[in-house]
UniProtKB/Swiss-Prot annotation:
Record bears the keyword Ribonucleoprotein: yes
Classification lineage: Bacteria, Pseudomonadati, Pseudomonadota, Betaproteobacteria, Nitrosomonadales
Family designation: Belongs to the bacterial ribosomal protein bS21 family.
PANTHER family named in the record: MITOCHONDRIAL 28S RIBOSOMAL PROTEIN S21, SMALL RIBOSOMAL SUBUNIT PROTEIN BS21
Annotated source species: Methylobacillus flagellatus (strain ATCC 51484 / DSM 6875 / VKM B-1610 / KT)
A single MF term (Gene Ontology): structural constituent of ribosome
Protein name as it appears in the record: Small ribosomal subunit protein bS21
């Protein structure tokens, strides 16, 4: 469980920002969203494979030189 102690004379916004940063760093929110609904193992494998293909094409596209338009 993540918790943030609000320091004396510290604005609420700053404490909230620290809390959000801590939650983001631990990956709690992404894990919670992933477990919101049950995902069948076959769907999970398909989703991960599609993401891997997308990453692969994105990496290839970033490594190729742009076409010259002159």
């Amino acid at each position: 469980m993540s918790s943030v102690r609000v320091k004396e004379n510290e604005p609420f916004d700053v404490a909230l920002r620290r809390f959000k940063r801590m939650i983001e760093k631990t990956g709690l929110l992404t894990d919670l969203r992933a477990r919101e609904y049950y995902e069948k193992p076959t769907w999970e494998r398909k989703r991960k494979a599609a993401a891997a293909v997308k990453r692969h094409y994105r990496r290839i596209r970033s490594q190729t030189l742009p076409t010259k338009l002159y």
